[in-house]
């Protein structure tokens, strides 16, 4: 298989682009580095394209390795033919290779292998050849052998049929066609083990759907119901069609001596060998496809969460709500430094005195540190805490706003080794409150400290392939961190770990170097960091910024390898280093990019990136994202009325709809059918993404079930 050509066709990009990208990956370059600094080589392939390419490249290389192993194994058995080799080499999936290898794979003891040991293979061949005119039962008597365990002609025939059944089951073409028939015409069914018990799987108690139509989230739902022993799930294949297909391909002519036996072997082969394994394969393939879709959605949601615009340079009070153990508070300054922590008890079990004390404490903190925003976690006791905040603001008139932030993962972080190292003198509640405050100030810098799987913007994330989920989300975080870039002198080790070319060990060494030698004043000093060699420097330098260093270019995304060309360009244009960042409109006055790039010895795309950086150094792509909604009053779920139009924030996007925070502590659902009135929506991500500010209308409110139905068809 020509892997380069295959990838070119699959990804719909030119062969030379794929070739260049593969070479760059094989040379040890990271995806963010290739995407940002090797645009000429790859024809501007972006992060998403490069990650898909890398994923498929890995799969296809593993496939080629597997083919080689299979060919060697069959050759060692002396059974490899030119035709079989060609079929294996042409296979495009691991399933296809498995089908071809099945007859030659070393098997555990089976009914067929036992029959072969009893010397019944010649009888099986006679029946399968379907040319015998003599009664098979008479011929079978010749194979009676008490020593081998064949006591009767009936046992001999049964053993022969077991061999034929396995031969049929091992036929690669039959398996492929039966699998295809099952996919095209089969159904998934589920029934409740205990129909009288009410569960969240009510919709699947008597459920049936065509395999070709079933949505990924329903596959994951029935899988979970099955895992929890609530549902029995089956694949119902078009059995009559499949048996008819096998009979047409296996039965030759109309030999009344052999045909009944061949039919029996076909039926047994399908029922005992083919159907169970095809059902498993179909379920696995459906699950894999559903998981891939869910992981993709999770990744897209995570991008939006990580890329939320920071609310920088604001003093924030982080509030981790709770009942019995009290609400933990942490005040952080505009740089994220913790100024103060405390615990208040305004929520149940409480007293008027404790509520008054809590409000007094809040007023003192707000006035002492000039708190501008309260960042309230959305966990247990959040509703009650919000009520206290609103009462306080109304009573005092303090110029403070509040926002409810998703605290998912805060408790995981607060109990982690990393949090202990960062806040050795704080308890888990204080750490959690500080994290809730900081994730408002700079969501990206704070959320990278948490396992992406714990952030909670997806569906069924705990049920799927954790390795694949982890790899995808790590890639998402890496892409986001490198798109934004980091300040070399303030970035934490967890944040630095996601920078291109830097691993956990090097990240810690950078922080240690900074603590020992003081601030970095130029990028080249990175080469003095332990274990950070020339290759790592090449990969990371452009993503690390020094805002007040000796070289103004170190504050930009211009890579050090392009400094000479950049300085030559600046000289040609009469630009002084002090003018960097004050060159609005520079890109418009350059008349001939190709000619100028050629003169400078760089590519045109690189030159355009350099010009953009000189105009606006280290631009933050998060600035273009919707700003979070700050509130000063509370709305209760009971206040909602049908027809009300509200502004909300998209919290989560899943296959069947969108969850929107409208400020009532219970996210409302906009079903996929309610997203757009002008066109059919195949997936919600076509319309909205996490973090979007949207206008919604209340369709219905169920206070008992705590369900809010919303529509965007306004």
Name each model feature, range by range:
Residues 49-52, 59, 63-318, 322-425, ...:
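Duplex nucleic acid-engaging cores and interfaces of nucleic-acid transaction enzymes
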Residues 37-39, 128, 238, 321, ...:
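Short, ordered loop/turn segments at secondary-structure junctions
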Residues 73, 87, 98-100, 225-240, ...:
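Structured, non-catalytic alpha/beta "coupling" segments that mediate domain-domain communication
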Residues 180-188, 319-323, 379-384, 405-412, ...:
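A glycine-rich phosphate-binding loop feature that marks nucleotide/adenosyl-phosphate handling sites
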Residues 546-714:
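Single-stranded RNA-binding regions, centering on S1/OB-family and related RNA-binding modules
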Residues 55, 61-79, 89, 421-519, ...:
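Long, highly charged, low-complexity intrinsically disordered interaction regions
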Residues 1-19, 26:
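Generic start-of-chain signal for non-secretory N-termini
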């Amino acid at each position: 298989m020509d892997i380069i050509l295959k990838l070119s066709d699959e990804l719909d990009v030119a062969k030379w682009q794929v070739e260049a990208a593969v070479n760059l990956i094989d040379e040890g370059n990271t995806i963010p580095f290739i995407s940002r600094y090797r645009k000429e080589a790859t024809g501007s392939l972006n992060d998403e394209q490069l990650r898909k390419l890398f994923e498929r490249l890995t799969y296809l290389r593993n496939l080629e390795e597997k083919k080689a192993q299979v060919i060697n194994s069959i050759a060692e058995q002396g059974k490899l033919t030119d035709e079989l080799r060609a079929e294996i080499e042409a296979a495009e999936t691991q399933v296809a290779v498995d089908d071809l290898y099945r007859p030659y794979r070393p098997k555990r003891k089976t009914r067929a292998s036992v029959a072969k040991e009893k010397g019944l293979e010649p009888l099986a061949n006679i029946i399968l050849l379907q040319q015998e005119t003599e009664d098979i039962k008479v011929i079978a008597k010749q194979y009676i052998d008490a020593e081998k365990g064949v006591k009767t002609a009936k046992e001999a025939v049964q053993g022969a049929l077991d061999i034929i059944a396995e031969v049929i089951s091992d036929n690669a073409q039959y398996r492929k066609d039966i699998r295809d028939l099952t996919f095209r015409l089969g159904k998934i069914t589920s029934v409740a083990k205990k129909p009288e018990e009410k569960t969240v799987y009510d919709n699947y108690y008597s459920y049936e759907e065509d395999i070709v139509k079933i949505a990924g989230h329903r596959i994951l739902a029935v899988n979970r119901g099955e895992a929890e022993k609530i549902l029995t799930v089956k694949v119902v294949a078009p059995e009559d069609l499949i048996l008819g297909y096998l009979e047409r391909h296996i039965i030759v002519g109309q030999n009344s001596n052999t045909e009944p036996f061949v039919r029996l072997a076909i039926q047994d082969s399908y029922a005992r060998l083919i159907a169970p394994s095809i059902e498993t394969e179909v379920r696995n393939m459906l699950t894999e496809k559903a998981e891939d879709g869910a992981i993709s959605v999770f990744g897209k949601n995570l991008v939006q969460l990580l890329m939320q615009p920071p609310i920088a340079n604001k003093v924030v009070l982080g509030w981790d709500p709770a009942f019995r153990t009290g609400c933990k508070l942490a005040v952080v300054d505009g740089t994220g430094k913790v100024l103060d922590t405390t615990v208040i008890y305004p929520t149940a079990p409480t007293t008027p005195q404790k509520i008054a004390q809590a409000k007094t404490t809040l007023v003192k903190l707000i006035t002492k540190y000039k708190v501008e925003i309260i960042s309230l976690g959305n966990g247990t006791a959040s509703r009650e805490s919000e009520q206290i905040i609103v009462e306080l603001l109304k009573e005092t008139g303090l110029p403070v706003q509040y926002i409810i932030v998703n605290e998912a993962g805060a408790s995981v972080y607060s109990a982690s080794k990393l949090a202990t190292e960062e806040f050795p003198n704080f308890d888990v509640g204080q750490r959690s409150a500080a994290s809730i405050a900081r994730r408002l100030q700079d969501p990206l810098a704070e959320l990278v400290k948490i396992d992406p799987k714990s952030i909670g913007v997806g569906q069924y994330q705990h049920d799927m392939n954790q390795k694949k989920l982890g790899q995808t989300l790590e890639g998402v975080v890496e892409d986001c961190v490198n798109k934004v870039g980091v300040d070399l002198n303030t970035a934490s080790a967890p944040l630095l770990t996601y920078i291109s070319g830097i691993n956990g060990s090097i990240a810690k060494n950078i922080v240690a170097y900074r603590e020992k030698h003081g601030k970095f004043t130029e990028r080249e000093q990175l080469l003095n960091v332990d274990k950070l060699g020339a290759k790592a420097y090449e990969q990371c330098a452009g993503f690390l910024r020094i805002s007040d260093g000796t070289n103004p270019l170190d504050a930009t995304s211009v890579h050090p390898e392009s400094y000479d060309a950049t300085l030559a360009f600046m000289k040609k244009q009469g630009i002084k280093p002090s003018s960097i960042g004050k060159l609005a409109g520079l890109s418009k006055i350059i008349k001939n990019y190709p000619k100028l790039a050629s003169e400078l010895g760089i590519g045109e795309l690189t030159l355009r990136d350099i010009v953009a950086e000189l105009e606006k150094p280290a631009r933050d792509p998060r600035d273009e994202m919707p700003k979070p909604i700050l509130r000063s009053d509370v709305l209760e779920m009971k206040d909602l009325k049908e027809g009300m139009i509200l502004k909300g924030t998209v919290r989560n996007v899943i296959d069947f709809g969108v969850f929107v925070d409208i400020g009532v502590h219970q996210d409302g659902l906009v079903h996929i059918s309610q997203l757009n009135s002008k066109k059919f929506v195949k997936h919600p991500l076509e319309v909205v993404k996490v973090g979007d500010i949207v206008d919604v209308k209340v369709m219905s409110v169920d206070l008992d079930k705590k369900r809010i139905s919303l529509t965007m068809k306004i």
